[in-house]
Amino acid sequence: LHDPCDNTEDCEDGLECNRNKCLIPYDSDKTCETGWDCVHGVWCSSFPGGSPGCRMDYRCKNEQCEDPATECVDEICGRKEGERCIGPCKAGLTCRNGYCRKPW
C-alpha cells in the first residue's frame, strides 16, 4: 500500500495505481485505515460490526455531480460553501461547525 507506481501492474494484487501510488479501489474487500489508503475521491468508512473499507465514492461522473449542493473540482464532488459537511468540502473550503466554510 502506498508504493510508488506507473500503472496498476506495478501494484500488489487487489490494489490500483492512482496518482502514482498503489491504493485500494472503491468497494474492494481490502481493509483501509484512513482515506489516504483509498483511490482519489473515495473515503474509508466502516459500518457497525464491519471492517473499514473504501466504500464512500465522491468522484464526479463525467465531470458532473448528482447532488446540486456539490460541485466537481479536481474529480471530486465537493460540498459548496454553506452546505453541511456530509461529504468532502469543495477545494479551498474546510468543515467548521458542521458546515463547509472558507478557512479562518
Curated annotation (Swiss-Prot):
Keywords: Disulfide bond, Ion channel impairing toxin, Neurotoxin, Secreted, Toxin. One of its GO terms (cellular component) is extracellular region. Expressed by the venom duct. Contains 8 disulfide bonds. It is found in: Secreted. GO terms for molecular function: ion channel regulator activity; toxin activity. The keyword Cytoplasm does not apply. It comes from the Eukaryota. Acts as a neurotoxin by inhibiting an ion channel. The cysteine framework is C-C-C-C-C-C-C-C-C-C-C-C-C-C-C-C. This is Turripeptide OL55-like.
